[in-house]
Regions:
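Alpha-helical transmembrane segments
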Residues: 2-45, 80-111, 145-169, 190-377
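Juxtamembrane helix-capping/reentrant segments at transmembrane boundaries
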Residues: 58-72, 126-138, 342, 347
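Membrane-interfacial loop-to-helix junctions in multi-pass inner-membrane proteins
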Residues: 95-103, 122-137
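Alpha-helical transmembrane segments within multi-pass membrane transporters and channels
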Residues: 111-118
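Membrane interface segments of multi-pass transport proteins and intramembrane proteases
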Residues: 120-129, 166-172
C-alpha cells in the first residue's frame, strides 16, 4: 500500500520517494515494521491469552523440566502472522502474484494450526487434529498453491523445472511435456510437479512444528532460515547477481525479499518474549504457518533442494522422529531416549539453554553452507 502510494503515485512530485523503488530499502523497513508490531503487541497478547486461559498443556511423559511450563500462554503464532502480513501489505508491490501466493500459504497453514490449537484447548489435552486430518488439510492447501503455479507456468511466469544444487545444466522438468498440448490432460501432465510441491511445503511445515519444543528453539532457527532464504530470493531476482552466480534470473520473485524480511523481523520480535524462560509459545498456528511459508518461498524461487540445508535443524529434527517411529515399529527398539532430537539431549542431562544455543549454531552453519553452494556449480 505504501509502495503504491509513495512510489507509484507520488514519486514524480518528490524525487526522494524513489527510495521506495529499491527492494533493499523496502525489505529493511518491512523487517523493522514487523519487529515493531511484534514488540508492541506482544505484552497485550500475552495478557489477553492469560485472561482467556489459553495455556499450554504439558504431556506427563515429557521431560520433567517442562512441567513448570504448564499454563504458559500459547497460540502466540497469531502475533507472528499479523506481524508478517501487515508489513508485507504495506511495503510490497501488491500487483505481484508471488506475494499473494506466499501470504496464502502463511494464512492457510496458520488457519490449520489455529484449528489444531483450539481443539487442544477445548479437550485440555495435547491432542488436537488427528495426524490424518492435519495432513489432509495441509496437502489440500499446498495442492492449491501448486495448481496456482501451474497456471503461472501456462502464462510463462513460472518454470516447473527442478534446479539441482552443484549442477548448472541439469534441470529436469517435473511435468510430462508430451501431455501438455492435450487440454484434457493438462493437470495430469503436471501431476509430478504438484506432488513435489505438496511434499516440500507440507514437509517444511511439519518439520518446523516438530522443532517447536524448547523455548526459542524453533523461532531462532526460523530467523536463520528465513534470513538465508531472503538472501537467495534477492539474488534470484537481481539480474547481475543471478548472472554472476549462473542461476536462473526470476525478476518477479525478487519482491518476495520483502516477505522474507517481514518473517525475520516478526520472528526476532517474537523471540523477545519466547526466549528462555518463555512468556508465550507460538503454538501450531505459528509453527505450521512459518514452516509452510518457508517451504512456499523455496518453491517460488526454485531452491527446493537447498531447503534441507537452509533449514538444517528442521530436517534433523524431523528425521529423528521418522527414525524413532520406524525403529520402534520394525524392531520394537528406540534409537533415541525421546524424539524429536532436542528431547533426547534433555534426557542426557543437557540444559535447555545449551541445547537451544548449540542447535542455533548448527542451523547457522547449515544456512551458510546452503549459500556457498550457489558458487559451487
Amino acid at each position: 500500500m505504501l509502495y503504491w502510494l509513495l512510489y507509484q503515485k507520488l514519486h514524480t512530485y518528490y524525487r526522494p520517494l524513489r527510495l521506495f523503488s529499491y527492494l533493499t530499502f523496502r525489505t529493511a523497513f518491512a523487517g523493522l515494521t514487523a519487529l515493531a508490531i511484534a514488540l508492541a503487541l506482544g505484552p497485550w497478547l500475552i495478557r489477553r491469552l492469560k485472561a482467556f486461559e489459553v495455556g499450554q498443556y504439558i504431556r506427563e511423559d515429557g521431560p520433567k523440566s517442562h512441567h513448570s511450563k504448564a499454563g504458559t500462554p500459547t497460540m502466540g503464532g497469531l502475533l507472528i502472522n499479523i506481524a508478517i502480513i501487515v508489513p508485507t501489505l504495506l511495503w510490497a508491490d501488491l500487483s505481484n502474484p508471488f506475494i499473494w501466493i506466499a501470504m496464502l500459504s502463511l494464512v492457510s497453514f496458520g488457519a490449520i494450526g489455529f484449528v489444531d490449537d483450539f481443539a487442544k484447548l477445548r479437550r485440555q489435552r495435547n491432542l488436537g487434529l488427528t495426524s490424518r486430518q492435519k495432513l489432509l488439510a495441509q496437502s489440500l492447501a499446498a495442492g492449491i498453491i501448486a495448481i496456482i503455479l501451474v497456471g503461472l507456468n501456462y502464462r510463462g511466469r513460472y518454470s516447473t523445472r527442478l534446479v539441482v544444487p552443484f549442477f548448472k545444466r541439469f534441470q529436469p522438468n517435473l511435468a510430462f511435456n508430451s501431455l501438455i498440448p492435450h487440454h484434457g490432460l493438462y493437470l495430469i501432465a503436471f501431476l509430478p510437479f504438484i506432488l513435489f510441491v505438496i511434499l516440500v511445503i507440507v514437509g517444511s511445515s511439519n518439520a518446523v512444528n516438530l522443532t517447536d519444543g524448547l523455548d526459542g528453539l524453533a523461532i531462532g532457527c526460523t530467523i536463520i532460515a528465513a534470513g538465508a532464504l531472503t538472501a537467495l530470493t534477492y539474488i534470484s531476482g537481481h539480474a547481475v547477481f543471478a548472472a554472476y552466480l549462473e542461476i536462473e534470473h526470476m525478476p518477479q520473485v525478487g519482491e518476495l525479499t520483502i516477505f522474507g524480511g517481514a518473517i525475520v523481523g516478526a520472528s526476532i520480535g517474537f523471540l523477545w518474549y519466547n526466549a528462555h524462560p518463555a512468556e508465550i509459545f507460538m503454538g501450531d498456528v505459528g509453527s505450521l504457518a512459518l514452516g509452510g511459508a518457508l517451504g512456499t518461498v523455496a518453491v517460488l524461487i526454485k531452491q527446493e533442494l537447498l531447503l534441507p540445508f537452509v533449514g538444517g535443524i528442521f530436517v534433523i529434527e524431523a528425521v529423528s522422529v521418522m527414525l524413532q517411529v520406524g525403529s520402534y515399529k520394525l524392531r520394537r527398539k528406540r534409537i533415541f531416549k525421546m524424539a524429536p532430537l532436542h528431547h533426547h539431549f534433555e534426557h542426557l542431562g543437557w540444559s535447555e539453554s545449551k541445547i537451544i544455543t548449540r542447535f542455533w549454531i548448527v542451523a547457522g552453519v547449515c544456512a551458510l553452507f546452503a549459500l556457498t553452494t550457489l558458487k559451487l556449480r
